[in-house]
């Protein structure tokens, strides 16, 4: 059985007919064609690679049906940059080597963007706690923590 849904995806209205049991991550990747959102844990919600923003909040898209997003606003990693300019968090990950293989990176960045919106001046312990829902098998997290800390400092400088 299929149904029609409409979402605002990275600022663009998208209407598609989808199977009622299609996961949001599959809708984003296979129907919309935005492959920056990854699937890592076979739909258990533990790795965070599928993290995107739904109405401004970080969610794991492998834990939600596409039909549940009908009428909602979605932002994926492809929508974080503005006018071709990387987001401060994206730049910080690049500058502080916060990635190796890159598989977890989009989820880490999406989580970090929302985390810094809620907590703009975090300490290292708070950053590490915020990363609990995102798994990285390559980096050991140290450079990811440095990147998020640097992004927070830059965001705070830009507000001053």
Where do the protein language model's features map onto the residues?
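Signature of N-terminal electron-transfer/Fe-S-associated modules in redox systems
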Residues: 1-160
